[in-house]
Amino acid sequence: MTSFVGLLDLPGIRWRPSPTDVDSSRETRELPVALARLLEPVDGLVAIDGGLHIRGARSRLPWHDLHPVWKGERVLSILYDAVTPEDVPFAANCMGDQFLLRDGAVVQLIAETGELEHVDASLESFLQRSAARDPEIWLGLRYLEQFELEN
């Protein structure tokens, strides 16, 4: 079993769910093992100064719950041809691009075009590199910063 970079290790945490936001009775068995393990201690969060949203699997909050975009009323595999029902949309950046787990690897769905780009070989390496990459470019954080300055 590999050691995981935990969600709380990500820099710039802006939000994380309170205990009342989490429905502990919800099952996580359908999730890939790595994602279920990652979400066990903290059911997702918003980190990297708002640039990265890791969705929760047991969330009571519709905007934070991964199930609607995975298997529910906003399922990405219907909205985008390149996304399959097996892809798990576990995260999004501040520009609306989605990060999907596909056969253990992380791919990025470019929301504007519907194209997929390979990002990392595993969820673990995705998290490790998330903190090291330039978030202004990689996550589109410069646009979020500009919006915050102007509003």
Residue ranges and their predicted role:
Residues 1-101:
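A surface-exposed partner-binding patch
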Residues 20, 51, 64-66, 102, ...:
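Generic alpha-helix signal with a bias toward terminal, lower-confidence helices
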Residues 98, 104-109:
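Short polybasic amphipathic segments
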Residues 107-143:
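Compact, glycine/acidic-enriched structural inserts
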Residues 144-151:
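Low-complexity intrinsically disordered segments
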